[in-house]
Regions:
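Calcium-binding acidic motifs and repeat modules
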Residues: 16-190
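Bacterial N-terminal signal peptides
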Residues: 5-14
Length: 190
């Protein structure tokens, strides 16, 4: 991820809550922001475009499901971090308000370079395109919020050829390699 992307993350963190339930409390998450438009999408969701810097262009687009028996429910939040008009971060939520997926375009080319998957609001898998070539080549698997296994396609052939197993503290405890290109671990080291 480019270093200046990290400078824009405070915008994302103030604008994207951990769960959709937090976002339903108010129409705008950031002080001073302005709701530009509210409309209905073809699939019946309420689309809300939010301008954080009051330049007349939306940096955030929220997609809500309106409910009669409960407050509106945030299903998706799209964020334009670098203000180029393209989505840089997309967060998706389930009907319980829990995050289910988040995608980040770290090099601002219009393609997701990092995708996190969540179950019951906890991250379970991350897919990462480490060289920004459009193909995910690193996969991280989480247990209780901690990376416990990493799988990597280091030669770009579409098959996993390196594995790392980590303990609860994040230290590597075992590694493996595929040396013959069949996608199966041939060499194990502890």
């Amino acid at each position: 991820m480019r270093s200046w992307t990290l400078l824009l993350l405070p915008l994302l963190l103030t604008a994207c809550p951990k769960t959709a339930a937090v976002a339903t409390a108010g129409a705008v998450a950031a002080p001073g922001a302005e709701v530009l438009t509210v409309s209905t999408t073809p699939d019946g969701l309420t689309e809300q475009k939010v301008d954080l810097d009051r330049d007349g262009k939306p940096e955030i687009t929220n997609y809500f499901r309106e409910r009669t028996d409960a407050p509106r429910l945030l299903l998706r939040k799209d964020t334009d971090l670098n203000r180029d008009g393209r989505i840089d971060v997309r967060a998706e939520f389930d009907d319980g308000g829990q995050r289910v997926k988040e995608q980040l375009d770290g090099d601002f080319d219009g393609r997701a370079d990092w995708v996190d998957h969540y179950i019951a609001g906890k991250r379970t898998v991350s897919e990462v395109d480490t060289d920004f070539n459009g193909t995910f080549d690193l996969f991280k698997y989480y247990e209780s919020g901690v990376v416990r296994r990493k799988e990597r396609d280091s030669d770009g052939d579409g098959r996993i050829d390196a594995w790392e197993y980590l303990n609860e503290a994040g230290a590597v405890v075992k590694t493996g390699k595929d040396v013959d290109g069949d996608g199966k671990m041939d060499v194990r080291e502890q």
